[in-house]
Amino acid sequence: MPREVRGNGEMFPLNGPCWSLFFEYIGNIVYALLIRRLSTRLLAVLSFALCCALTWFAVTDQSGYGSIGVGWTVDRTNILGGMLRMLCPFTMGILMSRLFKPLRQARGAFWTSAALLLIIFHVPYIYSDGALSLNGVFEAACIIAVFPLVVWYAASGKTTDIASTRICRFLGDISYPLYIVHYPLMYAFYMWLIKTRQYTLHETWPAALAAVSASIILAWLCLKLYDMPVRKWLRNL
Protein backbone atom coordinates (compact mmCIF):
# COMPACT_ATOMS: atom_id res chain seq x y z
CA MET A 1 0.00 0.00 0.00
CA PRO A 2 1.23 3.57 -0.63
CA ARG A 3 2.60 5.45 2.32
CA GLU A 4 0.23 7.90 3.98
CA VAL A 5 0.58 11.63 3.43
CA ARG A 6 2.83 12.46 6.37
CA GLY A 7 4.08 8.98 7.25
CA ASN A 8 3.50 9.18 11.01
CA GLY A 9 0.76 6.58 11.47
CA GLU A 10 -2.32 8.79 11.53
CA MET A 11 -5.64 7.07 12.27
CA PHE A 12 -7.27 8.94 9.38
CA PRO A 13 -4.42 9.69 6.95
CA LEU A 14 -6.55 11.49 4.36
CA ASN A 15 -8.21 13.80 6.88
CA GLY A 16 -6.34 13.90 10.17
CA PRO A 17 -8.88 15.78 12.37
CA CYS A 18 -11.39 12.93 11.96
CA TRP A 19 -9.65 11.24 14.89
CA SER A 20 -11.40 13.62 17.30
CA LEU A 21 -14.77 12.82 15.74
CA PHE A 22 -13.98 9.13 16.30
CA PHE A 23 -13.70 9.80 20.04
CA GLU A 24 -16.77 12.05 19.98
CA TYR A 25 -18.80 9.16 18.57
CA ILE A 26 -17.58 7.03 21.48
CA GLY A 27 -18.51 9.85 23.87
CA ASN A 28 -22.03 10.05 22.43
CA ILE A 29 -22.49 6.30 22.84
CA VAL A 30 -21.23 6.41 26.44
CA TYR A 31 -23.54 9.36 27.12
CA ALA A 32 -26.58 7.57 25.72
CA LEU A 33 -25.87 4.34 27.61
CA LEU A 34 -24.51 5.66 30.91
CA ILE A 35 -23.67 9.29 31.57
CA ARG A 36 -27.16 10.73 31.04
CA ARG A 37 -28.48 8.34 33.70
CA LEU A 38 -26.04 9.52 36.37
CA SER A 39 -27.13 11.83 39.14
CA THR A 40 -25.45 15.22 39.29
CA ARG A 41 -23.42 14.08 42.31
CA LEU A 42 -22.14 10.94 40.58
CA LEU A 43 -21.43 12.95 37.44
CA ALA A 44 -19.35 15.38 39.53
CA VAL A 45 -17.38 12.47 41.02
CA LEU A 46 -16.77 10.99 37.57
CA SER A 47 -15.70 14.35 36.17
CA PHE A 48 -13.30 14.92 39.08
CA ALA A 49 -11.74 11.47 38.62
CA LEU A 50 -11.27 12.12 34.90
CA CYS A 51 -9.69 15.50 35.65
CA CYS A 52 -7.22 13.80 37.98
CA ALA A 53 -6.43 11.16 35.36
CA LEU A 54 -5.92 13.78 32.65
CA THR A 55 -3.67 15.81 34.94
CA TRP A 56 -1.57 12.71 35.65
CA PHE A 57 -1.31 11.94 31.94
CA ALA A 58 -0.24 15.50 31.09
CA VAL A 59 2.06 16.32 34.01
CA THR A 60 3.95 13.01 33.89
CA ASP A 61 4.33 13.35 30.11
CA GLN A 62 2.81 10.00 29.18
CA SER A 63 2.79 11.04 25.53
CA GLY A 64 6.57 11.42 25.52
CA TYR A 65 6.62 14.83 23.86
CA GLY A 66 5.31 17.12 26.59
CA SER A 67 1.82 17.59 25.19
CA ILE A 68 -1.62 16.03 25.40
CA GLY A 69 -2.22 16.47 21.69
CA VAL A 70 -2.86 12.74 21.47
CA GLY A 71 -5.48 10.42 20.02
CA TRP A 72 -4.58 10.73 16.36
CA THR A 73 -3.04 7.28 15.92
CA VAL A 74 -3.83 3.74 17.05
CA ASP A 75 -1.56 2.78 19.93
CA ARG A 76 -2.01 2.35 23.66
CA THR A 77 -0.86 5.85 24.63
CA ASN A 78 -2.95 7.63 22.02
CA ILE A 79 -6.11 5.62 22.70
CA LEU A 80 -5.81 6.24 26.46
CA GLY A 81 -4.90 9.89 26.00
CA GLY A 82 -7.60 10.43 23.41
CA MET A 83 -10.26 8.95 25.69
CA LEU A 84 -9.13 11.12 28.61
CA ARG A 85 -8.89 14.18 26.39
CA MET A 86 -12.49 13.63 25.26
CA LEU A 87 -14.19 12.33 28.42
CA CYS A 88 -12.74 14.89 30.84
CA PRO A 89 -14.11 18.07 29.17
CA PHE A 90 -17.16 16.14 27.93
CA THR A 91 -18.32 15.26 31.44
CA MET A 92 -17.37 18.74 32.69
CA GLY A 93 -19.52 20.26 29.97
CA ILE A 94 -22.52 18.12 30.90
CA LEU A 95 -22.03 19.01 34.56
CA MET A 96 -21.82 22.71 33.69
CA SER A 97 -25.03 22.48 31.65
CA ARG A 98 -26.83 21.06 34.69
CA LEU A 99 -25.46 23.59 37.15
CA PHE A 100 -25.12 26.64 34.90
CA LYS A 101 -26.14 29.97 36.35
CA PRO A 102 -25.23 32.98 34.20
CA LEU A 103 -23.25 35.85 35.61
CA ARG A 104 -25.23 39.02 36.16
CA GLN A 105 -22.56 41.25 34.67
CA ALA A 106 -20.95 39.81 31.55
CA ARG A 107 -20.75 42.80 29.23
CA GLY A 108 -18.40 42.35 26.33
CA ALA A 109 -18.23 38.61 26.99
CA PHE A 110 -17.64 37.78 23.33
CA TRP A 111 -14.71 40.12 22.80
CA THR A 112 -13.18 39.42 26.22
CA SER A 113 -13.40 35.65 25.74
CA ALA A 114 -12.02 35.89 22.21
CA ALA A 115 -9.08 38.00 23.40
CA LEU A 116 -8.32 35.59 26.24
CA LEU A 117 -8.34 32.59 23.91
CA LEU A 118 -6.10 34.44 21.45
CA ILE A 119 -3.57 35.07 24.22
CA ILE A 120 -3.67 31.44 25.39
CA PHE A 121 -3.22 30.10 21.85
CA HIS A 122 -0.09 32.21 21.44
CA VAL A 123 1.64 30.80 24.52
CA PRO A 124 4.67 28.88 23.21
CA TYR A 125 5.69 25.39 24.24
CA ILE A 126 6.98 25.48 27.83
CA TYR A 127 10.18 23.49 27.98
CA SER A 128 11.24 21.54 31.06
CA ASP A 129 13.90 18.88 31.58
CA GLY A 130 12.69 17.52 34.92
CA ALA A 131 10.48 14.58 35.78
CA LEU A 132 7.34 16.70 35.40
CA SER A 133 6.21 18.45 32.24
CA LEU A 134 5.57 22.16 32.73
CA ASN A 135 3.85 22.28 29.36
CA GLY A 136 1.61 19.45 30.55
CA VAL A 137 0.77 21.49 33.66
CA PHE A 138 -0.20 24.44 31.46
CA GLU A 139 -2.31 22.35 29.09
CA ALA A 140 -4.09 20.51 31.90
CA ALA A 141 -4.82 23.82 33.66
CA CYS A 142 -6.30 25.22 30.46
CA ILE A 143 -8.53 22.19 29.87
CA ILE A 144 -9.69 21.78 33.46
CA ALA A 145 -9.93 25.39 34.65
CA VAL A 146 -9.36 28.11 32.07
CA PHE A 147 -11.48 26.87 29.17
CA PRO A 148 -14.53 25.99 31.33
CA LEU A 149 -14.37 29.47 32.87
CA VAL A 150 -14.19 31.02 29.41
CA VAL A 151 -17.22 28.99 28.31
CA TRP A 152 -19.12 29.97 31.47
CA TYR A 153 -18.30 33.64 31.02
CA ALA A 154 -19.05 33.66 27.30
CA ALA A 155 -22.36 31.81 27.81
CA SER A 156 -23.36 34.43 30.39
CA GLY A 157 -23.13 37.24 27.87
CA LYS A 158 -25.30 38.31 24.99
CA THR A 159 -24.32 40.08 21.82
CA THR A 160 -26.10 43.42 21.65
CA ASP A 161 -24.74 44.91 18.43
CA ILE A 162 -25.27 43.74 14.87
CA ALA A 163 -21.57 43.20 14.11
CA SER A 164 -20.92 40.91 17.09
CA THR A 165 -24.11 38.97 16.44
CA ARG A 166 -23.23 38.36 12.81
CA ILE A 167 -19.65 37.37 13.65
CA CYS A 168 -20.80 34.93 16.35
CA ARG A 169 -23.42 33.38 14.09
CA PHE A 170 -21.00 33.01 11.19
CA LEU A 171 -18.25 31.51 13.35
CA GLY A 172 -20.70 29.12 14.97
CA ASP A 173 -22.13 27.99 11.63
CA ILE A 174 -18.80 27.62 9.87
CA SER A 175 -16.79 26.04 12.71
CA TYR A 176 -17.81 22.40 12.22
CA PRO A 177 -17.61 22.21 8.40
CA LEU A 178 -14.34 24.16 8.45
CA TYR A 179 -12.88 21.75 10.97
CA ILE A 180 -13.69 18.72 8.89
CA VAL A 181 -12.73 20.01 5.41
CA HIS A 182 -9.63 22.15 5.97
CA TYR A 183 -6.98 19.48 6.45
CA PRO A 184 -6.81 18.02 2.92
CA LEU A 185 -6.09 21.55 1.72
CA MET A 186 -3.42 21.86 4.39
CA TYR A 187 -1.89 18.61 3.10
CA ALA A 188 -1.73 20.18 -0.37
CA PHE A 189 -0.06 23.23 1.16
CA TYR A 190 2.51 21.03 2.93
CA MET A 191 3.28 19.21 -0.30
CA TRP A 192 3.74 22.53 -2.10
CA LEU A 193 6.16 23.67 0.61
CA ILE A 194 8.23 20.50 0.29
CA LYS A 195 8.24 20.54 -3.51
CA THR A 196 9.16 24.22 -3.89
CA ARG A 197 11.39 24.41 -0.79
CA GLN A 198 9.87 27.74 0.16
CA TYR A 199 9.57 28.13 3.92
CA THR A 200 9.75 31.81 4.87
CA LEU A 201 6.67 33.97 5.45
CA HIS A 202 7.71 36.23 2.57
CA GLU A 203 7.74 33.26 0.21
CA THR A 204 4.68 31.39 1.42
CA TRP A 205 2.07 33.94 2.50
CA PRO A 206 0.22 34.01 -0.87
CA ALA A 207 -0.15 30.22 -0.90
CA ALA A 208 -1.05 30.18 2.80
CA LEU A 209 -3.71 32.85 2.26
CA ALA A 210 -5.08 30.90 -0.69
CA ALA A 211 -5.27 27.69 1.38
CA VAL A 212 -7.09 29.44 4.24
CA SER A 213 -9.49 31.22 1.88
CA ALA A 214 -10.23 28.02 -0.04
CA SER A 215 -10.90 26.18 3.23
CA ILE A 216 -13.42 28.81 4.36
CA ILE A 217 -15.17 28.88 0.98
CA LEU A 218 -15.35 25.07 0.81
CA ALA A 219 -16.69 24.90 4.38
CA TRP A 220 -19.35 27.50 3.59
CA LEU A 221 -20.42 25.57 0.48
CA CYS A 222 -20.63 22.33 2.47
CA LEU A 223 -22.71 24.12 5.10
CA LYS A 224 -25.18 25.62 2.64
CA LEU A 225 -25.39 22.82 0.08
CA TYR A 226 -25.15 19.75 2.31
CA ASP A 227 -25.20 20.28 6.08
CA MET A 228 -28.20 22.61 6.39
CA PRO A 229 -30.40 20.77 3.84
CA VAL A 230 -29.67 17.41 5.46
CA ARG A 231 -30.46 18.75 8.95
CA LYS A 232 -33.71 20.23 7.65
CA TRP A 233 -34.64 16.92 6.04
CA LEU A 234 -33.88 14.99 9.24
CA ARG A 235 -36.02 17.37 11.32
CA ASN A 236 -38.95 16.72 9.02
CA LEU A 237 -38.78 12.93 9.34
Tell where the protein language model's regions lie, with residue ranges.
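Acidic active-site catalytic centers that drive phospho-/nucleotidyl reactions
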Residues: E24, H182, D227
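Primarily interfacial, aromatic-capped hydrophobic alpha-helices that serve as membrane anchors
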Residues: A58-D75, L218-K224, M228
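Aromatic-anchored segments of alpha-helical transmembrane domains
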Residues: M1-P2, A49-S63, A115-Y127
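Intrinsically disordered, low-complexity segments enriched in small/polar residues
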Residues: F23, I174-P177, K224
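Hydrophobic alpha-helical segments with transmembrane-like composition
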Residues: M1-A58, L218, C222
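Alpha-helical transmembrane segments in multi-pass integral membrane proteins
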Residues: V5-N8, L34-L38, G69-I216, K232-L237
